[in-house]
Amino acid sequence: MRKLKLKINDKDYTLEMTRDSIKWLEAVGFSIEEFDKKPVTFYDLVWTSLFITNHKDVNPSLAIKLMDTYKKSGKNPAKVVRFAIEEYQAFMNALADTDSKENDEELEIIEA
């Protein structure tokens, strides 16, 4: 998975969407299919999830403050959220990839 590097308030942040951040998103109720119904809530959750792997000291409240600071500095948080959603979808596609040529492993299925 790709990583994104941001500088906010003169501090470097390495943001990424990982299995742990996706599990966190699921635990707090995120659903990509429901994004249209709760766009602001899910937008904030997706932004926040990017900090989970490398910045455990960043709680959801601080993550939102960092997003506001990022926006006030003239940058576009929507691009970061778009990156996160692309990474989320790539992870889900890889998880469900049953047609891959690399995945031609034969499984031995036995009756229980």
Question: Locations of the language-model features?
Answer:
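Charged interaction scaffolds used for protein-protein
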Residues: 1-12, 22-23, 27-37, 56-112
